[in-house]
Amino acid sequence: MDRSEIVARENPVITQRVTNLLQTNAPLLFMPIDIHEVRYGAYTLFMYGSLENGYKAEVRIENIPVFFDVQIESSNTNQLFLKSLLTAENITYERLETLTQRPVMGYREKEKEFAPYIRIFFKSLYERRKAITYLNNMGYNTAADDTTCYYRMVSRELKLPLTSWIQLQHYSYEPHGLVHRFSVTPEDLVSYQDDGPTDHSIVMAYDIETYSPVKGTVPDPNQANDVVFMICMRIFWIHSTEPLASTCITMAPCKKSSEWTTILCSSEKNLLLSFAEQFSRWAPDICTGFNDSRYDWPFIVEKSMQHGILEEIFNKMSLFWHQKLDTILKCYYVKEKRVKISAEKSIISSFLHTPGCLPIDVRNMCMQLYPKAEKTSLKAFLENCGLDSKVDLPYHLMWKYYETRDSEKMADVAYYCIIDAQRCQDLLVRHNVIPDRREVGILSYTSLYDCIYYAGGHKVCNMLIAYAIHDEYGRIACSTIARGKREHGKYPGAFVIDPVKGLEQDKPTTGLDFASLYPSLIMAYNFSPEKFVASREEANSLMAKGESLHYVSFHFNNRLVEGWFVRHNNVPDKMGLYPKVLIDLLNKRTALKQELKKLGEKKECIHESHPGFKELQFRHAMVDAKQKALKIFMNTFYGEAGNNLSPFFLLPLAGGVTSSGQYNLKLVYNFVINKGYGIKYGDTDSLYITCPDSLYTEVTDAYLNSQKTIKHYEQLCHEKVLLSMKAMSTLCAEVNEYLRRDNGTSYLRMAYEEVLFPVCFTGKKKYYGIAHVNTPNFNTKELFIRGIDIIKQGQTKLTKTIGTRIMEESMKLRRPEDHRPPLIEIVKTVLKDAVVNMKQWNFEDFIQTDAWRPDKDNKAVQIFMSRMHARREQLKKHGAAASQFAEPEPGERFSYVIVEKQVQFDIQGHRTDSSRKGDKMEYVSEAKAKNLPIDILFYINNYVLGLCARFINENEEFQPPDNVSNKDEYAQRRAKSYLQKFVQSIHPKDKSVIKQGIVHRQCYKYVHQEIKKKIGIFADLYKEFFNNTTNPIESFIQSTQFMIQYFDGEQKVNHSMKKMVEQHATSAGNSAGNPAGNALMRAIFTQLITEEKKIVQALYNKGDAIHDLLTYIINNINYKIATFQTKQMLTFEFSSTHVELLLKLNKTWLILAGIHVAKKHLQALLDSYNNEPPSRTFIQQAIEEECGSIKPSCYDFIS
């Protein structure tokens, strides 16, 4: 069944109507999905999408004018001069037209408002681009000068959205298989203003399953034996989750199912070709998968390349254009597309973009919707949305079923694969992804592809230009090319009032916020580039003529920046571009929110089974999508105005907005203080205010005259909240009237959001409390939290639980007559319970997440990933599976725990086991599999104590001296130190570790003194050897004999050291029989050898004396080598003195770790006797025969 048959089956009535319209050449509705340009030769724009009934359609738009504008000094400038410039550069153009427009930068008075421009028309984009580059280099200002995507300019000029219904008129029509082809001119396209009918575009959701014979690894398309063995697809209407058809293409026999059609292929090559064939039959408008841009598409493309069929596959999938392989790889295989996830994070996508089908990776969409999600798997996102989960089928079982070719089990694999595809569509529909992106495209005159793959800034730019170029906004000429020097620096910071830290249990605190501060400032003060006045002389001249100006000044990069903006004084004709656009967006959103409210009320009254419920639900979703798109643009507006890479960037405007925000918050602050209110905290756009005590006098007196029960106290708190709400409502109205008088407009307003009571401020942007919005609500389980670490991404359940316990306990209503425990007491009580009662914590409480960003200097993650890389390499050497230690994709989050390492000390009692986080991190799966112990103390010290310190750092004992600049940091550090000592006092294991360290230090001090005595004796003996010139050999032998006597057998030394350790460890109250005691003995003996190495270094430095000694020995050895191929024997002739000396040398040099010296000379001896030395095994055998068994053998010297 192909697409046309599905459409006819599902939509027979609409299909008949569309057929009749086609036969009579009547106007048709068309929904564009994908856009492609023909940029060579005559410019042509292709739009792909569907007709009203779901037929696949291609709309070819011809005769699109190709032009750009260039500003000239005066209208009298002869066009011949511009023609001569272009001709001199061999730039071919069609014609020139003169017009007038308003430049976007700088204020121009009424009589000089418009400037002359010349519009230059071309036959091709190539010549246009050459001309733009040339004239910009010559210093001319250009407009309508898009150089990357010309279709955006076409959309703006024609006011033709690329993501909503378009009416086709006066078209020429040609059916072509599954595709209905139309040819039109720009005049034949009419934007359809109504919502239009239900969209019947088709979505194909798919999933692939891959196999590798190397167990435990992720299949790699570059490995010949790794294959894709199954591809499952489901198609849907774009708005529905009910499948229209399903197909499973497999290389292993699969039991038939009524839920899908099975296609059995004999090879991977045939499977890929079948996928392309099925793709072409359904001709989807959108192709979607989960993480397919990171895995599925790269796998399919790479395997198609290996089989030499990528060109054939592309041309099967593309119903419109057939291309050669090099063109496919260059223009249609998007190998690295950076997709913005959040302000800090981007992700690389790869996909095959066939004309007419838009690829969408559902994982990328979900990550944009949940930028702080700690888990980004399909299962996690389904759980977040409350959708049915995916099927649980481990990979090792799937691969086993594929290897055994069990048809019933392969049916389970097919079902698993099909359901994964189904869940992709479920997520797209649940999140209203396509309608939301379409509304953004309608507002910004960009394509659906732009709305999915580009950040918000360029869409705001495009929307601004679309508003600017039309008559109702003054025909402002806008360029898309950023000009001028781009400076980097900080704009004026926000006005901040330091919080009054601590727990407030007596008076409610109310938040007063500016509504959309920066957009409101732009509307109030007429911040817009074409309203900017740069010089004081011009500003004075304008004010003398009666103009009202808003002055801005601020410091930027150590200089004063100043300027003026001509105010609109509420006169529409005087409003700048930015305020006009924002006011239009605001009015539209207000109307939509009102409609949304009415639709929501209707939804509440109608049951899901009602015939009109689905239509109502659809309408509600569409209106919601429109108001969301408007909100996105309003919130992104200032970001683009302050972006120094934007063509609209103006430094005085960007800094002027923030400095005006400072001014207005200070204004409100002073107004509120003068009214007798108190300020708890203020930052950027909000103030937290307390009412005067007199407001509560009456209700407080009533409580004091009551029996003061807890019920009476709760009633008192209830009435205080109500009084605060009423007072704040009045204050808010007074503040807004005060602001209106100050700035002359009603755009800048504050709103009362909530009353917080009780409330606790712990730092800047860090506070929590019980929020009362419409009515009092003292539920401690629903806290209002801002900036506290428990809501921080990556935090463990342990930290969240402890933090929540502290906050909930501190929010309980307590009468003044009762004991009100201070925060420090609450923190210590909760912390003690957490530390002492360790059994209450489960493994899951310690799981945390982090992001792998190779370019970021996150030392712990870098160390951890380095360790995992080393593990993978080690396992690969032994042919073992290493997938459990796989490195995440850059930007991807991964889960881990901190595990406990054995406590170790050096000889001086210092901890030698690594305390670095990166050395203690382990993947969750690995820690679970090996049952590794969790380092609970690490979590307490490194995560929990910092959080707990935040609650108590306002205590007097933690406050810094007056000369400390960063008082909050100082207090936080002191509070954390205090809690660390508290934990050490209650944690038994920590005390044990400290005790072990003390014992080590005591033992070291005693034993080291004994070692030094012995070393002194050895040093004196060898000094005698160096100074004895008459008989150095005899002196050396005597020194060696003494050393052998002292170190005769490692056991004696160990035994001696053990006795010393036991004696002093026992006296210090520690058992030497434990592992730590044994480790201490090993460490002490190692230190002994280390001290002796100093003598070895002295010997090495006396190299000449050693060389003479060894030369004497060598010259007295008759070293004969027979032909070992025949005799298989090596003969030595030693005197008894020489053998004894060799034995002594062997033991002495080994003990002194001087093998490197002996090895150097003895190896030289071997090399001098034979150009081709015997094999190592042969030498070892010969020496053992002649010298007997020496442990360690003399072979160690030679080899």
Curated annotation (Swiss-Prot):
<keyword id="KW-0548">Nucleotidyltransferase</keyword>
<keyword id="KW-0235">DNA replication</keyword>
<dbReference type="GO" id="GO:0000166">
    <property type="term" value="F:nucleotide binding"/>
</dbReference>
<keyword id="KW-0808">Transferase</keyword>
<dbReference type="GO" id="GO:0006260">
    <property type="term" value="P:DNA replication"/>
</dbReference>
<keyword id="KW-0239">DNA-directed DNA polymerase</keyword>
<keyword id="KW-0244">Early protein</keyword>
<dbReference type="InterPro" id="IPR006134">
    <property type="entry name" value="DNA-dir_DNA_pol_B_multi_dom"/>
</dbReference>
<keyword id="KW-1194">Viral DNA replication</keyword>
<dbReference type="InterPro" id="IPR006133">
    <property type="entry name" value="DNA-dir_DNA_pol_B_exonuc"/>
</dbReference>
<dbReference type="InterPro" id="IPR050240">
    <property type="entry name" value="DNA_pol_type-B"/>
</dbReference>
<dbReference type="InterPro" id="IPR042087">
    <property type="entry name" value="DNA_pol_B_thumb"/>
</dbReference>
<dbReference type="InterPro" id="IPR036397">
    <property type="entry name" value="RNaseH_sf"/>
</dbReference>
<dbReference type="InterPro" id="IPR017964">
    <property type="entry name" value="DNA-dir_DNA_pol_B_CS"/>
</dbReference>
<dbReference type="Pfam" id="PF03104">
    <property type="entry name" value="DNA_pol_B_exo1"/>
</dbReference>
<dbReference type="InterPro" id="IPR012337">
    <property type="entry name" value="RNaseH-like_sf"/>
</dbReference>
<comment type="function">
    <text>DNA-directed DNA polymerase involved in viral DNA replication.</text>
</comment>
<dbReference type="InterPro" id="IPR043502">
    <property type="entry name" value="DNA/RNA_pol_sf"/>
</dbReference>
<protein>
    <recommendedName>
        <fullName>DNA polymerase beta</fullName>
        <ecNumber>2.7.7.7</ecNumber>
    </recommendedName>
</protein>
<dbReference type="GO" id="GO:0003887">
    <property type="term" value="F:DNA-directed DNA polymerase activity"/>
</dbReference>
<dbReference type="Pfam" id="PF00136">
    <property type="entry name" value="DNA_pol_B"/>
</dbReference>
<dbReference type="GO" id="GO:0039693">
    <property type="term" value="P:viral DNA genome replication"/>
</dbReference>
<dbReference type="InterPro" id="IPR023211">
    <property type="entry name" value="DNA_pol_palm_dom_sf"/>
</dbReference>
<dbReference type="GO" id="GO:0003677">
    <property type="term" value="F:DNA binding"/>
</dbReference>
<keyword id="KW-0238">DNA-binding</keyword>
<comment type="similarity">
    <text>Belongs to the DNA polymerase type-B family.</text>
</comment>
<dbReference type="InterPro" id="IPR006172">
    <property type="entry name" value="DNA-dir_DNA_pol_B"/>
</dbReference>
